[in-house]
Amino acid sequence: MSTTPPAPAAQPAQQAPTGPVTAYLPQGGFARAVATRLAGDGDVVIPVDQGLVSAYIPYADRAVLIADPDQSGLREDLDTLSFTRGMPSLGLELFPTELRCGPLVVPGRSACYRCYDRRRRQHGYRPLPPEVASEHGPLEQAYAHHHVLLGAGLISLALQALDTPGPQEQAAESADDVAPIGGQVWTIDLVSGITTCSPTVAVDRCETCSGRYEGRRDGLPALAALLPERRGEVA
């Protein structure tokens, strides 16, 4: 006598994310600890220890790179991803004596990382020499549990600034104008405990963000540069 097989158990419907989706891009042990603490149910964590490949980064509303000091290559790749997709981005670095979070890059409304790096060098900062970085790789920093908490707090603060428009931004939106958003850099001195926040001033004629105040800016021109034979379709 044949029997009817039991019906398969009902699978719960996958819920859509209720808030912005964040792509966390960790490089190194400290970064993985911070990303694990921050990532929510709808967020994605993509390790970038071997490099940041934009094709591997799924859809997200914003991207956060957490890395060891002086990872300029990763930061520039993040800038490219950010401006191509029109997606806000942020970086967190652990230095021997400080945590640095920023700049908060908002394509079309803020300066980019390249501007920040140039301004920092103008003020005397000297990163790790490229030949040392290529020979020895990233200089991974030792960290304690409270460093993870502080780093997660800085990222949360930056994302809150992104999600909560200020009075100046609301006034600009009502006047049908585009107000600058982002560009902030937050730092915590791990010796004194002093926390600071400073803006990033864009460099004139920057190749990445010189059109940052154009309200209609999007990623199509950058895409067209990769597909010259189809440039007329997106002009």
Residue positions per predicted region:
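A short, well-structured beta->alpha microelement
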Residues: 36-59
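Short amphipathic alpha-helical face segments that pack within enzyme cores
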Residues: 33, 150-158
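Structural motif
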Residues: 24-29, 47-50, 65-70
